[in-house]
From Swiss-Prot:
SMART domains: PH, RhoGAP. InterPro entries: PH-like_dom_sf (IPR011993), PH_domain (IPR001849), Rho-GAP (IPR050729), Rho_GTPase_activation_prot (IPR008936), RhoGAP_dom (IPR000198). GTPase activator for the Rho-type GTPases by converting them to an inactive GDP-bound state. Has activity toward RAC1. Overexpression results in an increase in actin stress fibers and cell contraction. The record marks R317 as: Arginine finger. This is Rho GTPase-activating protein 15. CDD domains: PH_ARHGAP9-like, RhoGAP_ARHGAP27_15_12_9. It is a peripheral membrane protein. PROSITE patterns: PH_DOMAIN, RHOGAP. It comes from Homo sapiens. The keyword ATP-binding does not apply. Residues 1-23 are annotated as: Disordered. Residues 79-189 form the PH domain.
Length: 475
């Protein structure tokens, strides 16, 4: 290979020491020291003789490009924390409301984003490898909350992003949706709340890149081709584009200040602008507000059922009208005056449905998560008396709101069982209805079927041996 005497560059040719390969690496070195400070050396690879890969653009790069490489890890390095199928509906895009349209999506949760795929798991993973870009949600600054009023479906929560996008996620299986809710909430809580969030820096990086490096590259290539009289117009466009970028950054900065200065939920609650709800609140918080160990709403529902529902066929098994149940739930959450003898609550299945919903929506079930394994171990004991004593001992260790509410509820359910000849609700039937609602593991690990058996058995034991576990109802 020959060197040109008129060229400013020298070419070093390195032959591969392995036989059978024709790869030759060429380095372009700049002989001009001043020009070397303004440009970068690039490498070209010869894959076959006579074939050269297209050289990388040699425009100058600004300093921010090198800094952000360390600030923003590549997306491929994000760890997948959870994945699976959920029902998804996008109800807002950039603050603009959209028509709700439910669809099944394969959802992938990483450390700071959620990605939605329309395909099956295998297709989704294939597309991820081939560079397919799914719809994604940036969790930095996002907000997650239960959204029962947004849909007639059960187990619905909403994710709202800082960009104004809103998504609803849903599953009919309680423990699955709870697991997803806690996983996403934990991911959001781990992310920074200010502009140091990597995902926000990524957005800024995109704006800076589009307005600086790419523009400079475009200018650098065009300036050589166009005539001198056109250079002034190019410089004007360059200055005008930089001005637009400055305006965008100014607006972005103001929006960021506005968002970060919003009052916290705790502040709004202290001022009375936002009230704690009954549904979806922790049991001990509801009892603290009411200065009681048994929620007022639970006692109201039990009183109504015992007054006019003990003989009703399928009581607690038959579902009431969901719209009416949601209406009752709304009234209770607004702390409005409630009279369950009113004609609009005439269907007793609406009252029982609302009571089951109250227990189902507790962030932590009536049997606390920390006691789950202990109750399971107790129910596994072979001797019946030993089993009863073990369960009784655990019940006595429960926090007062849990223990007292449990006593009132199961005392009420024993009255249902006493009328089983009329309402056809046996101990086993009530165990199936209330077991998974009152008792569940914090994190299911594939033993859902086994856990369900234990959940039902524990609820049945609490009913059949009520007097031995809690004492007489009058105690």
């Amino acid at each position: 290979m020959q060197k040109s005497t008129n060229s400013d560059t020298s070419v070093e040719t390195l032959n591969s020491t392995r036989q059978g390969t024709g790869a030759v690496q060429m380095r372009i070195k700049n002989a001009n020291s001043h020009h070397d400070r303004l440009s970068q050396s690039k490498s070209m690879i010869l894959t076959d003789v006579g074939k050269v890969t297209e050289p990388i653009s040699r425009h100058r790069r600004n300093h921010s490009q090198h800094i952000l490489k360390d600030v923003i890890p590549p997306l491929e390095q994000l760890m997948v924390e959870k994945e699976g199928y959920l029902q998804k509906a996008k109800i807002a895009d950039g603050g603009k409301k959209l028509r709700k349209n439910w669809s099944t999506s394969w959802i992938v949760l990483s450390s700071r984003r959620i990605e939605f795929y329309k395909e099956s798991k295998q297709q989704a993973l294939s597309n991820m490898k081939t560079g397919h870009k799914p719809e994604s949600v940036d969790l930095c600054g996002a907000h997650i909350e239960w959204a029962k009023e947004k849909s007639s479906r059960k187990n619905v929560f909403q994710i709202t992003t800082v960009s104004g996008n809103e998504f609803l996620l849903q599953s009919d299986i309680d423990f699955i949706i709870l697991d997803w809710f806690h996983a996403i909430k934990n991911a959001i809580d781990r992310l920074p709340k200010d502009s140091s969030c990597p995902s926000r820096n990524l957005e800024l990086f995109k704006i800076q890149r589009s307005s600086s490096t790419e523009l400079l590259s475009h200018y650098d290539s065009d300036i050589k081709e166009q005539k001198p009289e056109h250079r002034k117009s190019l410089m004007f466009r360059l200055h005008h584009s930089a001005s637009d970028t400055s305006d965008k950054n100014r607006v972005k900065s103001r929006l960021k200040k506005f968002i970060t200065r919003r009052p916290s939920l705790k502040t709004l609650q202290e001022k009375g602008l936002i009230k704690d709800q009954i549904f979806g609140s922790h049991l001990h918080k509801v009892c603290e507000r009411e200065n009681s160990t048994v929620p007022w709403f639970v006692k109201q529902c039990i009183e109504a059922v015992e007054k006019r529902g003990l003989d009703v066929d399928g009581i607690y098994r038959v579902s009431g009208n969901l719209a009416t149940i949601q209406k009752l739930r709304f009234i209770v959450n607004q702390e409005e005056k409630l009279n369950l003898d009113d004609s609009q609550w005439e269907d007793i299945h609406v009252v029982t449905g609302a009571l089951k919903m109250f227990f189902r929506e507790l962030p932590e079930p009536l049997f606390p998560y920390s006691f789950f394994e202990q109750f399971v171990e107790a129910i596994k004991k072979q001797d019946n008396n030993t089993r009863i004593e073990a369960v009784k001992s655990l019940v006595q260790k429960l926090p007062p709101p849990n223990r007292d509410t449990m006593k009132v509820l199961f005392g009420h359910l024993t009255k249902i069982v006493a009328k089983a000849s009329k309402n056809l609700m046996s101990t086993q039937s009530l165990g199936i209805v209330f077991g998974p609602t009152l008792l569940r593991a914090e994190n299911e690990t594939g033993n859902m079927a086994i856990h369900m058996v234990y959940q039902n058995q524990i609820a049945e034991l609490m009913l059949s041996e009520y007097s031995k576990i809690f004492g007489s109802e009058e105690d």
